[in-house]
């Protein structure tokens, strides 16, 4: 079985309202060029392309087909798509290399979240029989989750504000993030609720954006990248889709995926947590101690483009290895309501 590594990553600037169309082409073309130039590759070198996006954001069926224009319609390429975050497209690309069907693969995710009312669009992923007809929006569900944790003594509003303050401070060095001036915990707690107990800083901003990651196998990875980020564990698990049948203050699927992937050795963890309390849940589920640097990029709280933010977390985790800032890192992505489905990718450097 071939070893597989991340050799390139690029992310479009996170924007609250991009002038780009919903097919993502305007966001993808620049970052395709950026990542291919950085790795010394051309489009012809890529043996497999896989995208992650959603027709629900674009408002039309098979909307991802238009995004292929960013690759180029001719000559034909081997291409696939997942109606998921681009992190799951990366998983498919990883399997393609492991199966020996490609040496180099490129995964990308994109989403124009501002095209509709995102918190209502996400209600369409709920149980269609009992929950979705009530139209509880994504922020309201997250607020219920946060309140359950507070009442159970698992965390406090102060803990949540501390996550927001740290994320804002970390994002200052990330030129692609939506950066707000960092405030103190006390200042954040003095702000009004948007959905009790959530304040604006507890919620990831509605974001338009895209991300791309290039994988290569074995000797090709070593030849193309001075310090590849080798994938040593890649797992995803899912909890019940029924909100009433699981403990929303925990994320068992994240813990299971982390243990299977070997998350315990991570020095840096990039977690896809769209709400402050969800970062706290994930840190507990993945058993991340205080010695682990969590979301040094600022995380999803400083830019959460739908269907690209999870892939970007893996990209930032890989960047920490490729730059020499860490030996072992963890990238995480989530999907579904209240951390229902979770994916963990562990990356490390090798001599």
Q: Where are these predicted regions, by residue range?
A:
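Flexible glycine-/small-residue-enriched beta->alpha junction loops
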Residues: 105-153
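Short acidic capping loops at alpha-helix termini that bridge into adjacent secondary structure
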Residues: 42-48, 158, 264-267, 290-291
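Short, well-ordered, mixed-charge alpha-helical segments that flank or form enzyme active sites
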Residues: 113-117, 169-174, 338-339
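Loop/turn elements at helix/coil->beta-strand transitions in domains of secreted/extracellular proteins
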Residues: 2-5, 47, 101-102
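Claisen-condensing/thiolase-fold acyl-transfer catalytic domains that form or cleave C-C bonds
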Residues: 22-25, 29-30, 53-106, 110-111, ...
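Short, conserved active-site entrance elements at the starts or edges of catalytic domains
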Residues: 185-191
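N-terminal leader/propeptide and maturation segments of large enzyme subunits in energy/redox metabolism
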Residues: 136-184
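Generic N-terminal amphipathic, Lys/Arg-enriched alpha-helix
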Residues: 3-19
């Amino acid at each position: 079985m071939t070893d597989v590594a991340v050799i390139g990553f690029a992310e479009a600037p996170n924007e609250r309202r991009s002038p780009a169309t919903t097919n993502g082409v305007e966001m993808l073309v620049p970052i395709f060029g950026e990542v291919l130039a950085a790795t010394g590759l051309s489009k012809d070198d890529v043996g497999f392309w896989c995208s992650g996006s959603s027709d629900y954001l674009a408002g039309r069926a098979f909307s991802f087909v238009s995004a292929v224009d960013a690759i180029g319609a001719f000559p034909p390429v081997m291409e696939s798509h997942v109606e998921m975050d681009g992190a799951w497209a990366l998983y498919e690309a990883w399997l393609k290399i492991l199966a020996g069907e490609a040496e180099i693969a490129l995964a990308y995710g994109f989403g124009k979240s501002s095209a509709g009312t995102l918190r209502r669009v996400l209600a369409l992923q709920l149980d269609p029989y009992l929950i979705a007809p009530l139209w509880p929006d994504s922020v309201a569900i997250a607020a219920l989750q946060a309140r359950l944790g507070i009442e159970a003594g698992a965390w406090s509003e102060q803990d949540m504000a501390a996550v927001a303050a740290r994320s804002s401070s970390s994002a200052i060095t990330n030129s692609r993030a939506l950066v707000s001036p960092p405030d103190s915990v006390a200042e954040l707690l003095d702000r009004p609720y948007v959905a009790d107990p959530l304040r604006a800083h507890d919620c990831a901003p509605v974001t338009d954006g895209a991300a791309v990651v290039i994988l290569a196998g074995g000797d090709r990875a070593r030849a193309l990248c001075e310090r590849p980020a080798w994938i040593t564990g890649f797992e995803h698990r899912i909890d019940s889709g029924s909100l009433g049948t699981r403990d929303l203050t925990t994320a068992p699927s994240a813990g299971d995926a982390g243990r299977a992937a070997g998350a315990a050795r991570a020095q840096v963890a990039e977690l896809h947590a769209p709400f402050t309390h969800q970062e706290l849940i994930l840190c507990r589920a993945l058993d991340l101690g205080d010695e682990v640097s969590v979301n040094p990029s600022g995380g999803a709280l400083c830019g959460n483009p739908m269907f690209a933010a999870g892939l970007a977390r893996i990209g930032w985790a890989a960047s920490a290895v490729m730059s020499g800032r860490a030996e072992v890192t963890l990238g995480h992505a989530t999907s579904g309501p209240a951390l229902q489905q979770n994916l963990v990718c562990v990356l490390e450097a090798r001599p």
